[in-house]
Amino acid sequence: MESPLGSDLARLVRIWRALIDHRLKPLELTQTHWVTLHNIHQLPPDQSQIQLAKAIGIEQPSLVRTLDQLEDKGLISRQTCASDRRAKRIKLTEKADALIAEMEEVIHKTRGEILAGISSEEIELLIKLIAKLEHNIMELHSHD
């Protein structure tokens, strides 16, 4: 009998995300907010929405909804690009700067707890296997 690997991976992602959402709730953030803020923080300043969507690996319309929420919370600002009026540049606010370390601490602690009892060799192997699966899937997409 074949292993339901796809279902297992999907379930793992769902419960991991739910735990992150739960742990970030006191900060009034979600896993989606964290991924977005983390990427804005890691990328060079004044990224466009298009560049940010590519870095995260999502479509721009999906990103816009999250950016609207983060802007409403006062965590980002968006300005129209001088050279391309259709493009928006994204910046973290001072409020976000203060929150980033707290948010990253929650993520780091949670990741450590999730990976407890798993050796660094096992984690490296898992990362390699996931990369192979991703490569195979991308190859299949390119042939369809």
From Swiss-Prot:
Keywords: Activator, Cytoplasm, DNA-binding, Repressor, Transcription, Transcription regulation, Virulence. Gene3D superfamilies: Winged helix-like DNA-binding domain superfamily/Winged helix DNA-binding domain. It is found in: Cytoplasm. The keyword ATP-binding does not apply. Disruption phenotype: Decreases expression of genes encoding virulence proteins. Decreases virulence in mouse. SUPFAM superfamilies: Winged helix' DNA-binding domain (SSF46785). Induction: During infection of the host cells. Down-regulated by itself. Activated by Mg(2+) starvation in a phoP dependent manner. Residues 49-72 bind DNA. One of its GO terms (cellular component) is cytoplasm. Residues 2-135 form the HTH marR-type domain. It comes from the Bacteria. One of its GO terms (biological process) is response to stress. GO terms for molecular function: DNA binding; DNA-binding transcription factor activity. InterPro entries: HTH_MarR-typ (IPR000835), MarR/SlyA-like (IPR039422), Tscrpt_reg_MarR-type_CS (IPR023187), Tscrpt_reg_SlyA (IPR023071), WH-like_DNA-bd_sf (IPR036388), WH_DNA-bd_sf (IPR036390). Belongs to the SlyA family. HAMAP family: HTH_type_SlyA. Transcription regulator that can specifically activate or repress expression of target genes. Required for virulence and survival in the macrophage environment. Probably activates the transcription of ssrB. Independently of ssrB activation, capable of stimulating the expression of virulence genes found on pathogenicity island 2 (SPI2). Probably activates expression of ispA, xseB genes, and of omp operon. Homodimer. This is Transcriptional regulator SlyA. It comes from Salmonella typhimurium (strain LT2 / SGSC1412 / ATCC 700720).
